[in-house]
């Protein structure tokens, strides 16, 4: 599954790949809880639109995101697409 995917750009952007779990993950830092929650809200709108949802947690200004395609048992292009969008939203 992940073998055919080009993970290099995402890894260079700070994402981590756990091949045993089939997961991409990244931690995002924000100055305030409100900024972190706003980021999560923006991501949630895209995730709902694309029907592909992250596993994540939030503690004050930190948001930890993990992506996998549970139905496929690992990473798919949907995860990479959402990861790219998440990076775009974090930079906005």
From Swiss-Prot:
Pfam families the UniProt entry points to: Pterin_4a
Xref: Gene3D superfamilies: Transcriptional coactivator/pterin dehydratase
GO molecular function: 4-alpha-hydroxytetrahydrobiopterin dehydratase activity
HAMAP family found in the cross-reference section: Pterin_4_alpha (MF_00434)
Family: Belongs to the pterin-4-alpha-carbinolamine dehydratase family.
Annotated protein name in UniProt: Putative pterin-4-alpha-carbinolamine dehydratase
Keywords per UniProt: Lyase
UniProt key word Transcription: no
Keyword field contains Lyase: yes
Reaction catalysed by this enzyme: (4aS,6R)-4a-hydroxy-L-erythro-5,6,7,8-tetrahydrobiopterin = (6R)-L-erythro-6,7-dihydrobiopterin + H2O
InterPro entries per the UniProt record, alphabetical: PCD_sf, Pterin_deHydtase
EC number: 4.2.1.96
Organism name: Cereibacter sphaeroides (strain ATCC 17023 / DSM 158 / JCM 6121 / CCUG 31486 / LMG 2827 / NBRC 12203 / NCIMB 8253 / ATH 2.4.1.)
Cited SUPFAM superfamilies: PCD-like
Gene Ontology biological process: tetrahydrobiopterin biosynthetic process
């Amino acid at each position: 599954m992940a073998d055919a995917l080009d993970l290099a750009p995402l890894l260079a952007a700070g994402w981590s790949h756990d091949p045993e779990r089939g997961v991409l993950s990244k931690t995002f830092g924000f100055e305030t809880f409100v900024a972190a929650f706003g980021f999560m809200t923006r991501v949630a709108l895209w995730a709902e639109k694309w029907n592909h949802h992250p596993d994540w947690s939030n503690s004050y200004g930190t948001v930890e995101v993990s992506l996998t395609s549970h139905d496929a048992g690992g990473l798919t292009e949907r995860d990479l697409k959402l990861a790219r969008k998440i990076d775009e939203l974090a930079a906005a």
